Amino acid sequence: MFVLLVAYALLHIAGCQTTNGLNTSYSVCNGCVGYSENVFAVESGGYIPSDFAFNNWFLLTNTSSVVDGVVRSFQPLLLNCLWSVSGLRFTTGFVYFNGTGRGDCKGFSSDVLSDVIRYNLNFEENLRRGTILFKTSYGVVVFYCTNNTLVSGDAHIPFGTVLGNFYCFVNTTIGNETTSAFVGALPKTVREFVISRTGHFYINGYRYFTLGNVEAVNFNVTTAETTDFCTVALASYADVLVNVSQTSIANIIYCNSVINRLRCDQLSFDVPDGFYSTSPIQSVELPVSIVSLPVYHKHTFIVLYVDFKPQSGGGKCFNCYPAGVNITLANFNETKGPLCVDTSHFTTKYVAVYANVGRWSASINTGNCPFSFGKVNNFVKFGSVCFSLKDIPGGCAMPIVANWAYSKYYTIGSLYVSWSDGDGITGVPQPVEGVSSFMNVTLDKCTKYNIYDVSGVGVIRVSNDTFLNGITYTSTSGNLLGFKDVTKGTIYSITPCNPPDQLVVYQQAVVGAMLSENFTSYGFSNVVELPKFFYASNGTYNCTDAVLTYSSFGVCADGSIIAVQPRNVSYDSVSAIVTANLSIPSNWTTSVQVEYLQITSTPIVVDCSTYVCNGNVRCVELLKQYTSACKTIEDALRNSARLESADVSEMLTFDKKAFTLANVSSFGDYNLSSVIPSLPTSGSRVAGRSAIEDILFSKLVTSGLGTVDADYKKCTKGLSIADLACAQYYNGIMVLPGVADAERMAMYTGSLIGGIALGGLTSAVSIPFSLAIQARLNYVALQTDVLQENQKILAASFNKAMTNIVDAFTGVNDAITQTSQALQTVATALNKIQDVVNQQGNSLNHLTSQLRQNFQAISSSIQAIYDRLDTIQADQQVDRLITGRLAALNVFVSHTLTKYTEVRASRQLAQQKVNECVKSQSKRYGFCGNGTHIFSIVNAAPEGLVFLHTVLLPTQYKDVEAWSGLCVDGTNGYVLRQPNLALYKEGNYYRITSRIMFEPRIPTMADFVQIENCNVTFVNISRSELQTIVPEYIDVNKTLQELSYKLPNYTVPDLVVEQYNQTILNLTSEISTLENKSAELNYTVQKLQTLIDNINSTLVDLKWLNRVETYIKWPWWVWLCISVVLIFVVSMLLLCCCSTGCCGFFSCFASSIRGCCESTKLPYYDVEKIHIQ
C-alpha cells in the first residue's frame, strides 16, 4: 500500500458559524447523537486517548484500502487542536493551517503549522447539503456534487446517506475565468473529508484528487439540524501502528517510545517476552562531511533557462499545452554540436524564467538518465560529459515538463546528455578553482559523507592506526572502514551510525538493552561491561532467578543480567562406581575411535533494517512498504536461536551430589579410615591387636622364618614354661624365636643359677638354658643364611631382568611415538571437523559480500544513489537494492534454519550416545564406535562433544552353520532361550556359542525352550494384502510406476560441477593413515607381550622372612603396684558408701544395739479412722 508522506490537519464539523475565518456562533451540544463517543480532550503532546473509539475515522490511502489487519503508516493522528461545534446552520469560514480561524481547543493545543484539515461528520441518517471551498495561491476552488451528469445541475454536497448517484466536480476561478473538472462519483455514505496542505483531498479515507498547495478551507452546511454536530481538529503527521477493522480505525499506537517503536517494528500491539533487535532513533537531517584529493580545479557552469506562456484570452484552454515555449542552454551553439565540459569541475543550474503563469510550473525530470540534472552537483564523477538541446546518439534524455496544478502534465522539451564513466570531471555544488584539497569532516557524530568520491553514512573518528599505503580502506563487502588524510597522514575510521541493539522485553516493558557501545538512549542508569557487549538496565543485580534466558545468560524481572548455570538435578539414589577387569580374547583387538557431534551453534541475530539500509532514513521508509518482511526474517532467526538455547539448556545438566561422590578421596565430611578392616594373615586371624592391647603391652616387630613363629605361638598358648617344649624345626634344625620376654629370661636365669650352685649334682638343671640358647642361635644363623641365598638370587635375576626391561621400554617408546602420530592424525581430522563447524562464519561472510552487489541498480551505495538521482528515481533504484538484499537475507535465513535443524538432530543423537554409550554399555553393534562396545568417554569440544569409544574389533572369524532349534523324533521342538546364542555342529558334536564372541561350549537343557511341535506355519497371502498386515510395507516397484505416470515432461537442467556448493568432509587419507598406525601399534603390542613374558620368567621366588609382632608382658612388680592401687581405691569407695547417710551400714548397726539395750517393744502408734466419701 502506497503511504503518502504528508501530515494532516483534522477538522470534525457539526454545527457552527464563522465570519472572516472566525467562528461567530456555536454551542456545545451535549444532547447530540454520539457526542460523548466522538468528542475527547487531547492529551499532552497531541496524542489521542487510548480509549477513543475512532468512529468514522479512516486510514488514509492513495490506492486500495485495508479491510482488516495491522498496518504501520504515517497518518494525521498527532493533533494540534480539537474542538466541537453544533447548530441549525453553520459555516466555518476559512480555517487556516496555521490555526487561524480555529475554536476553543479541548485539551492540548499547539500553534505549529498543521498539515491537514479533516472533517468528521456526525449527522443523523437524513440528508444534509453543503459545499467546500479551498483558498489557493492562484484563486478559489469549489468542490461540489450533483445528481445530474451535466455540470449545470444543482451544485451541492450531500452529507449523510445519499440516495441516487452524485457526480463531483471542481470549479477553479482564476481572475474572471472559471473552469470545471470532473473528479469522481460521491460515495453513498459520506462520513469524513480530509484536505492536506499539499492539496490532497480524501473522502472516507480514499484520495479523490489533488489540487496543489492549499492555504485555507471553508466548510459550509446549509441544512443542519439541532442534533447535528462536528469536531474540528488540526493535526500533523505521525508514525503510528494502526489496527484496521472493516476499513475503520479500531485503535492506534504512536511509535514514539522505545517499547512502542518495538511494537511498530514487530507489527504487534503486544510484544511477547524476549530479545529484539532495534536501532536508536536517528535524526533525519545529518551534517555533511566531504574529503577530496588535492587537485587543480577549473570550473564551468551549465545553465538551463526555461520559459513558457500558457494559453490566454477568450475561448482559450488555459490548462492545455502552453502557447509558447523558450528553452535555452547557456553557451550552447547548435551548429557546433553538444556543449561539452572541458574543465575538472562543473556545476549545473536550472533557471525558471517564466512568470505570472498562475497554477502552472515546470521542472526537469531524470528521464532515462542514471542521474538527475540537479543531483550531479553532489560530486558525481564522469570521464566526459556533454549537454545539448538536440538529440545525441547514444545519450540519454531529461524531459522538461510543464504541469497545471499538478494534474495535467506536458513535455515542452528535453535536455540530452552524453557521458562516459571516469573520474576526470566532477560535479560540485559551488565553483572551485586553483590547487586545493577540501576536507570538512564532522567527528564523533553521525554524518553523511563523500570521501574520495565514496558516499555513505557513518561516524568518523580519529584512529591510532598507521598505514603506509592506501588512502581508503574497505571490508570484503565493500563498506568503507577508514581513510587517510593525504595532506597530514592522519587515519580516520568509519563505523555505522547506529549499531543495532538488543532490547529485553518482559511484561510489555523494556527492562534491559545489550549495546555495542557504552552509550544508551533508552533511559537506563546502570551500564555494565561484559566480555562481548555492554548491558544497560535499572536492575539491582542481586537476583538469582532469570525470567528470560538466552545462550549462557539470563535476565531477571528487574532487568538484571546473570549467568545461567546448567540445571542442577538430584536423584534419590546414586549408583556406585564399579570397576572390573575385562578379559579380551586373542582373536580380538581393542580400538579407540573418535567421534565428533555438534550440539550447538552460535546464535545469530540480523538487524534487517541495518543490513538492508545501513541507516539511510529514506531507505528505511521504503522498507516499511514490505510490511512484515523484516519481521519474518528476524523472528525466524530469533525464535530458532531461543529454541536452540532452550534445547541445549535442557540437555546439559549436572548432579552436584553425584559429582562429589565420584571423587573417591572425599565422601563429604566423613573419615572412613576407622571402618576399613585390617588385612588378614593366615586363617581367620587378624594381623594386629586391639587399641587396648597396644596400650597395655610393648610391641616389638621382628622377622621370622616361614611359619616358625606362628606355630610356636599356637603351641605355647602364652605360657612361658612351654617355651622349650614348643621348639620348632626348620630344615631339620631346632629353632626358637629370637625374642624372649622377662618371664622367660627369669626362668632360664634360674635354671642357669641352679645348675651352677651345687656343681655336678645340679648341672642337669642348666640343660634347658643351653638348649634354648642354642635353638635361638640356630634361628639367627638360619635367618642369615636365608638372607644370603636371597641376595644371590636377586643379583642373578636382576641382571637378567635389566636387559628385558630395557628392551621393553624401547618398545614402549616406539609405541608412544606411533600413538603420538596417530593422535596427530586424529587432530588433523578434528581440524577438518572444525572447518565444517566454521561454515557459519563462511555463511556470514557470504551474506556481507552480497552488500557489494548492486542488484541491477546504478550503485551498491544507497547514499550515492540519492546523491545522483531525484527522490522518485532514486527510490526506484533503492527498491532494487532492498529486493536483492532481502532475497540474500532470506537465503541466509534458510541456510541458518537448515543448520539449526541439522544441529538439533545431531544434538539428539549426542544425547542418545551419552545415555547409551557413556552411562551404559551399548548392545547395538556400530552405534558406539564401529565395533562391539566396551565403554566410552565424552569430552567437551567447540560447539559439540567428542566421544572416545573403546570397542572390540574382530581379527579372526569362525565360520559355522547355525540352526534355530532342534526337532526330536519329529514331534518335540526346542529353540534357544537366549537370542544372542547360536547352535552349530562341529564335527560329530553340537556346540553353543555367543554371537558376540566365539566361546563354544556343550549345550545344556537350560539353553533351550520346548515349543509345541516342529511344524513351521506360514500364512499364504498376495502382495496386495501384505500392507494390510504390515502397514509400513511399501511396494517400491509399484510406487515408482505410479510416480512415473504422474511426472510431467521435463528437461534435465544443465548443472555444472561449479554450481554444487556443499562442504565435503574427506577423511580417506587420514583414516588410511590411522589404520596403518593401528597395525604398527598392534605389532608393537605383540612384541611387548613377548618381552613381558620374558620379564615374568625372571620373577624371584624368595624365601620370605615373616614379619612377626611380639608383645612383651610387664614384670611382676608392675602388676603388684597396679593391684595395690586398685585395693586402695576400692576400700575408699566402700568406706564412703557404708559410713554416710541414714541408711548407711554403721548407722543401721548402731540403731540396732540401742534398741536391744532399752526395750524390745516397738513404739505404739494410735490409729485414727478416716471415712472418705
UniProtKB/Swiss-Prot annotation:
Query: Outcome of mutating residue 414 to T, per the record?
Result: In strain: Isolate P100E
In this chain, the stretch annotated as S1 covers: 16-536
Q: What is the effect of changing residue 430 to K?
A: In strain: Isolate A162
Which Pfam families does its entry note? CoV_S1, CoV_S1_C, CoV_S2, CoV_S2_C
InterPro entries assigned: ALPHA_CORONA_SPIKE, CoV_S1_C, S2_sf_CoV, Spike_S1_CoV, Spike_S2_CoV, Spike_S2_CoV_C, Spike_S2_CoV_HR1, Spike_S2_CoV_HR2
- Outcome (variant: residue 441 to A): In strain: Isolate LRI 281
Domain remarks in the Swiss-Prot or TrEMBL record: The KxHxx motif seems to function as an ER retrieval signal.
What's the protein name? Answer: Spike glycoprotein
Organism of origin is Human coronavirus 229E (HCoV-229E)
